[in-house]
């Protein structure tokens, strides 16, 4: 079926979203045009405003419309000297939802990947190095993803911490709550055994 140029353009634009293929984009476009034009206009306005006004925190690099985000400006967050290093702002949301952490963050916006040409400065490790040199950080909690790249990134940052005599710790990896051992992959089970603790 031949569609209008503007409709094709809308569907192509929707495909930039993760997990949205041609069929999903077509379904979304038709829904907005046929059933929810007001919602479509609100979406367009919110996207336009977010794309122009949301930047990065000058301390932790997460998304914010201010120069410094609400976490970094919170005096209670600065007292404990902890900084949790994560790969994306979505990781902050996940950790905050637990209610178990009350320190500050540093967002890498990715991980080291020499094969893809992503080096230390590409993920802000020069900025992290500067923050470590300031002397107000006593512990770095490495919460990068448990992938090969995430582990390499965590190791690199741990070396950086050692150079500045700052404690570095890695979040635990292992068997998920409610998981069955026979269904857990070997690497995860190995991490669980190596990271065991007394009860």
Curated annotation (Swiss-Prot):
Gene3D superfamilies: 3.40.1360.10, 6.10.250.240, RecR Domain 1 (1.10.8.420). Residues 81-176 form the Toprim domain. May play a role in DNA repair. It seems to be involved in an RecBC-independent recombinational process of DNA repair. It may act with RecF and RecO. GO terms for biological process: DNA recombination; DNA repair. It comes from the Bacteria. A zinc finger (C4-type) spans 57-72. Coiled coil: none annotated. Belongs to the RecR family. InterPro entries: DNA_Rcmb_RecR, Rcmb_RecR, Rcmb_RecR_Znf, TOPRIM_dom, TOPRIM_RecR. Keywords: DNA damage, DNA recombination, DNA repair, Metal-binding, Zinc, Zinc-finger. Disulfide bonds: none annotated. This is Recombination protein RecR. It holds the Pfam family Toprim_4. GO terms for molecular function: DNA binding; zinc ion binding.
């Amino acid at each position: 079926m031949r569609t209008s140029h503007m409709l094709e353009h809308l569907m192509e634009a929707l495909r930039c979203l993760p997990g949205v293929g041609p069929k999903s984009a077509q379904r979304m476009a038709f829904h907005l045009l046929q059933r929810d034009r007001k919602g479509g206009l609100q979406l367009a306005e919110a996207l336009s405003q977010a794309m122009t006004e949301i930047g990065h925190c000058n301390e932790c690099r997460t998304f914010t419309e201010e120069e410094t985000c609400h976490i970094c400006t919170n005096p209670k967050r600065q007292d404990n000297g902890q900084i949790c290093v994560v790969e994306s702002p979505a990781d902050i949301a996940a950790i905050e939802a637990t209610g178990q952490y009350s320190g500050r963050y540093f967002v890498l916006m990715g991980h080291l990947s020499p094969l893809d040409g992503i080096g230390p400065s590409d993920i802000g490790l020069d900025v992290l190095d500067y923050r470590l040199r300031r002397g107000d950080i006593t512990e770095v909690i490495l919460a990068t993803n448990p992938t090969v790249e995430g582990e390499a990134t965590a190791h690199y940052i741990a070396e950086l911490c050692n150079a500045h005599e700052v404690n570095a710790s890695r979040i635990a990896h292992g068997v998920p709550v409610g998981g069955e051992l026979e269904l857990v992959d070997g690497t995860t089970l190995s991490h669980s055994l190596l990271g065991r603790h007394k009860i």
